[in-house]
Amino acid sequence: MFGGGARRRNPGPQKGRDVRYRVEIAFEDAVTGARRRMSMADGSALDVNIPAGITSGQVLRLKSQGQPSPSGGAPGDALLEVDVLASPVWTRDGKDLRMALSVDLRTAVLGGTVEARTPSGPVSLKVPAGTNTGAQLRLKGKGVQLTPPGDLYVRVEIVLSDPKDDGLRKWAEGR
């Protein structure tokens, strides 16, 4: 009366296997977002949308870019574990970026405009008269391009444009 066992359902075609890759992303691409063609370890190339604000250790999932299904189902996904490369110019602090910028003594004393490098390109930065080494100047909206975007904080480092300047030496000795 109750025998015969349970019927097995045919699960249908199975999805292909997911494939994991580790990828290195340029600091600028992680900050501003980008679309890049990346070569994978197996020789394949994938077009990847890199979202602004991505950090090392996050995983990007590319649907149907993994192994094909052995039973006619959908292909698996490609899982890209991200490693954001360090920048020689900027460091990241959440949504904000930080950098040091050399400013000549004349500009620091009298004030002026200098060029500051941002991940999206160079911008003009106003240096107020009397700026000291270590002063922090803010470039609003020039940090990680999230909503709202972060800021770029520039730490001023005063440098002598000509350390053998006789006028500067005489001024210093006259004190």
Map each language-model feature to its residues.
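Short acidic/polar mixed-charge low-complexity motifs
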Residues: 25, 42-46, 121-123
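Intrinsically disordered, low-complexity linker/assembly segments
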Residues: 49-175
